[in-house]
Curated annotation (Swiss-Prot):
Pfam families the record matches: Inos-1-P_synth, NAD_binding_5
Annotated EC: 5.5.1.4
Species annotation: Rattus norvegicus (Rat)
Protein's name according to its UniProt entry: Inositol-3-phosphate synthase 1
Family annotation (Gene3D superfamilies): NAD(P)-binding Rossmann-like Domain (3.40.50.720)
Pathway: Polyol metabolism; myo-inositol biosynthesis; myo-inositol from D-glucose 6-phosphate: step 1/2
Encoding gene, per UniProt annotation: Isyna1
Job of this protein: Key enzyme in myo-inositol biosynthesis pathway that catalyzes the conversion of glucose 6-phosphate to 1-myo-inositol 1-phosphate in a NAD-dependent manner. Rate-limiting enzyme in the synthesis of all inositol-containing compounds.
Activity regulation details: Inhibited by 2-deoxyglucitol 6-phosphate (dgtolP) and 2-deoxy-D-glucose 6-phosphate. Inhibited by copper, mercury, cadmium, zinc and copper ions. Activated by potassium and ammonium ions.
Amino acid sequence: MEPAAEILVDSPDVIFGPEAIEARYEYRTTRVSREGGVLRVRPTATRFTFRTARQVPRLGVMLVGWGGNNGSTLTAAVLANRLRLTWPTRTGRKEANYYGSLTQAGTVNLGLDGDGREVFVPFSALLPMVAPNDLVFDGWDISSLNLAEAMRRAQVLDCGLQEQLWPHMESLRPRPSVYIPEFIAANQTARADNLIPGTRAQQLEQIRKDIRDFRSSAGLDKVIVLWTANTERFCEVVPGRNDTAENLLRTIQLGLEVSPSTLFAVASILEGCAFLNGSPQNTLVPGALELASQRHVFVGGDDFKSGQTKVKSVLVDFLIGSGLKTMSIVSYNHLGNNDGQNLSAPLQFRSKEVTKSSVVDDMVQSNRVLYAPGEEPDHCVVIKYVPYVGDSKRALDEYTSELMLGGTNTLVLHNTCEDSLLAAPIMLDLVLLTELCQRVSFCTDSDPEPQGFHPVLSVLSFLFKAPLVPPGSPVVNALFRQRSCIENIFRACVGLPPQNHMLLEHKMERPFPGIKPEEVKATSPLPCKKESTPATNGCTGDANGHTQAPTPELSTA
C-alpha cells in the first residue's frame, strides 16, 4: 500500500502542533419546535475546539475467542500483511491486503482542486492512526488449539497462505477462558478443554491478571478487548442483580448468574481497557454500562455488521428513501462454521434474530408519509446450520414493496458471504477507531472544560448490527449516515467542514470563484472502453448475442 501524502489544513482555526492537532470548529445544526400546527425550525451554531493527540501508542488487542474463525483469520491477516506474503491460487497469485477495512481500504474526499476535480485520500491519512501491522495480539479461548491449528480448523484461508503462516502462528496459544455451559449451545462442549477454574469472582480476577500480564510482558501502552467468541443467550436484566454497577459487582462476588461475556466486559473496564462486543447477546447490561461511565472507559457493540445485514441497511434505506413502501423483508441464511453450529440452538438463535431484525427500525420511523405510527414491515429471519458450506455463508433475501396505484415490486438477492473474511477487517476497524477516539478531546465556548466522547462509543455504529448508543440518543442503522458520522467527526478534528455532497461549484450558471472553467462540450454517451471482439460463434461483442446484420441500404428512388 502506498503511503498517503501528508495533509496540512491551511486555516487560522487549525494548529498542527508537535503533540496535538487543535481545531476550532463551528457545529451547525437545527432545533425544531412544534407550535400548534407549525414546525418552527431554528438554525443553531456551537463553537467547538477539538484536540487530537498525535502520539500513536503501542497497542495490544486481546480477543475473547482468539482461536475461533474470526480470531485466527484476523491474526493471520495482520501477519500476512506484516510479512508481505504472496501465495498461488487457481486464479493466479494473491498478495496480502486489508480489503474490507474502512480505515485501510476506504477513502475520504478532501475537497476540490483548482480544476474542480474531487481529491480523495485514504481514510487513515486524515488523522494519526495506529498502523495495523504494528498490532500485538493475545487472547482467550475455551479451545486449547494453537493459532496455527485453529487456522487449519477454520478452513478459511488458502493452503498456500496457511503453509507460510504456520511457523508464525504455531507459537500463539490462547489463554484459558470462561465456560458456563448454559449460555452457549450444548454442541460446544467438545471444544471446551481450556478453562479458567474457580468461582465467578476468581474468574474475574484471573481475566484482570491476564490483561495486566499481557500489557506488561509485551510493553504496551494500551490494550483493547474484543469479544469475538460464541453467541450467548440473552441475560435477563434483573433489578438488584445487574441493573447497577454496584449490584453487578456484588452478583459476581456472590456467584449469581452473569454471562461469560459480561465477566470479560467488567474485567476490561476495571483494568481501564475499552471493551467491544462483536456478538449479538446483551453483554453490556445496565450495570456494565454504568461501570464504564464511572470509570470513563469506552464500550461498544453489538454484533459485527458484515454481510447480509450490511446489505439490508443499504437496500432498505434506498427503498424507503426512494418513496417505496417496503412491506415484507424475508432473510434466510445457511452456514457451516462453528458460529452456525452454535446458532442452531434456539436460545442462541434468538439473540442473533433480535439484532438482525432491528436494523431497519430507524429507516421505517423516519418516513411517516409511508408508515403510520406503529406500522412496520413484516420481517422474518431464518438461520440454518449446513456443515458442508463451512465459512462460506449463503444469504437469500426477498424485499417486497408497494408502488403507486396498487403495484408491487419484489427484489430477490443471493449473497455468498465469506463470513470471517468479512468480519476480520471490521474487527480491525473497531480497534483502530476506538484507540483513535481515546486520543480525541473537545470543549465548547460555553463549557471550556475538556471532555471526551461518551463511554458508549456510538461513533462505531457503522460496524455493528445493533449499535449501542448513550441513553436518549437516536439509533441510526442506515449505513451511509453511519459512515458520514465517522467521516465528518474526523474532518471536524482537523477543522474541515462536513461533507455535504452539494457540489454547488458545478451547478452555477457562471464560473465559481477559484475554479477554472472548462469548455462546454456537447453531451453524448460515454464511449465504450472495450472494443467489440469477434466471438467463436460469429457474433460481435456489441450485437446482444446476435449475428451482426448488415446495414440496410436505403432506396433513393
